[in-house]
Amino acid sequence: MIQMQSMLDAADNSGARSVMCIKVLGGSHRRYAHIGDVIKVTVKEAIPRGKVKKGDVLKAVVVRTRKGVRRPDGSVIRFDRNACVLLNDNTEQPIGTRIFGPVTRELRGDKFMKIVSLAPEVL
């Protein structure tokens, strides 16, 4: 469960290391974001010569959460850290060309097939 002020890791090679959620998109009073939801983030820590810099405000899709996701068979997939993939604000396609770490099967909708295909492992 990601809410405003939540810190997340960037799971791509866009140049961001750490980002902070500043808004959960998808409703006027929406409080929490889960895996597959789009959020607005600001870059808190970035590497030199990256595609994004500290202070940039971007969209991101949540790919891993500590809370996890419940499957219809009753199993729960949880992760150690919260992580997201940064998106281009206009096209909502990933900024980076590589994805680090596993992603869940719940991202396999039409919008995020690119992220699933770039990921090294799909759980």
Curated annotation (Swiss-Prot):
Here the disulfide bonds are: none
**Which Gene Ontology cellular-component terms appear in the entry?**
cytosolic large ribosomal subunit
Q: Name one GO molecular function term.
A: large ribosomal subunit rRNA binding
InterPro entries linked to this entry = Ribosomal_uL14, Ribosomal_uL14_bac-type, Ribosomal_uL14_CS, Ribosomal_uL14_sf
Keyword terms, alphabetized: Ribonucleoprotein, Ribosomal protein, RNA-binding, rRNA-binding
Highest taxon in the source lineage: Bacteria
What the entry lists under SUPFAM superfamilies is as follows: Ribosomal protein L14
Q: What is this protein called?
A: Large ribosomal subunit protein uL14
Q: What is the lineage of its organism?
A: Bacteria, Pseudomonadati, Pseudomonadota, Gammaproteobacteria, Vibrionales
